[in-house]
Amino acid sequence: MREGISAFLEEKQGLSVNSKQSYKYDLEQFLDLVGERISETSLKIYQAQLSNFKISAQKRKVSACNQFLYFLYQKGEIGTFYRLELPKQAEKKQVQSELLDLSSFWQESAYPEGRLLALLIVELGLLPSEILALKTNDVNLDFQVLRINKASQQRILSLSTNLLGELEPLMGQTYLFEKAGKPYSRQWAFRQLEAFLKEKGFSDLSAQGLREQFILRQIEEKVDLYEIAKKLGLKTVMTLEKYR
């Protein structure tokens, strides 16, 4: 079976030396795990091992192995055409880690509360619970900042001119989101957010997904992980390490 790697690479025209070495390494590692007799079971074992690698490496290895499996099938070395798939968790991470165009969030909506919730999350990285606890006196219009008080800790976040314009009309209230002077429940917030995201065609997103979009935008702007952690109210950067 191992000699099949050399034969496979010989048929790969136009590959650079580095690319051939990469193919060879991935395929030898593949055979080390599945053994000389390829089966559905051995492939599942290999596929489970893929989750230990970064997503980019997983995609490369799956592509190389699928090409090799097809080559073996064509040559009659294996009687079944097997095909590996990217681990589900990797697919999920891939989707969640994609920087999305959310410019439509600034457009009018039939769900204005859900819209503002979404903007506060994606622009400032706030949690729904933090947003619902916000009082209008936490907003300083003159200095364009927002004060977050949580668990005896305070953090100050800068407000963009656009976001400030969204908050100004609410300054006569006690809370940013309230009914008869009392804050809305978390369930209400999630319903409003869900309805807004569905309206804008992002029904697969959630508050957590929007918070990740904030992180991705910060990284795109070359903001240091420690500074991002500070903005999010995190004590360490541990949960942000995957974005390095």
Language-model segments: residues:
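Short, basic (Lys/Arg/His-rich) helix/loop patches that form interaction surfaces
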Residues: 194-230, 234
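Active-site/catalytic core of tyrosine-dependent DNA strand-transfer enzymes
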Residues: 160-203
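DNA breakage-rejoining catalytic core of tyrosine-based enzymes
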Residues: 78, 88-104, 152-161
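Alpha-helix N-cap/helix-start motif at helix boundaries, enriched for small hydrophobics
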Residues: 117-118, 126-134, 215, 228
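Short functional hotspots where side chains directly engage DNA or cofactors
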Residues: 144-148, 217, 226-244
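Conserved tyrosine-mediated DNA breakage-rejoining catalytic core shared by Y-recombinases
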Residues: 134-165
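Basic, Lys/Arg- and aromatic-enriched nucleic-acid-binding interface segment
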Residues: 99-128
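N-terminal core-binding DNA-recognition domain of tyrosine recombinases/integrases
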Residues: 3-91
